[in-house]
Amino acid sequence: PAEVELVTGAPRGELVNNFVASICDGKLSDALTALGAVAESGNDMKVFLKLSIQKMRFALLLKVAPELEKMIAEEISKEDIQILKTIGAEKGSKLTSQTLVELLGAYEDIGKAYAPELPIELALVKILSQNDAQAKG
């Protein structure tokens, strides 16, 4: 796995899982910290976001359609499935289809920004600020 990460520019799975968990937990600071670690490590930001979106998609599918677990198990490890089930099942999870929509928009904008992490940072602020406003309202 370390060789694959080095050759492809893919981030460690732990970074992706921490990032996804931070978003789902509504922890903007933690999500931005994870994103900063990816930027500092020189990993490809587009690959990182693609992996993150994939995991969030699977977590959302496991939440709304648990019968798809077998299909998802063909794509990711058993350990990841357990992590994603936990993330999606937590009360107050910020895992929504709108979160995925925002991240997909950021994915498209990565190549257009002067700093590849900028579109992701903006999406995080939008996603988690909306969630904060809804929680307070």
Name these PLM-found stretches.
Residues 1-136:
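Extended, largely alpha-helical regulatory/partner-binding modules appended to the mid-to-C-terminal parts
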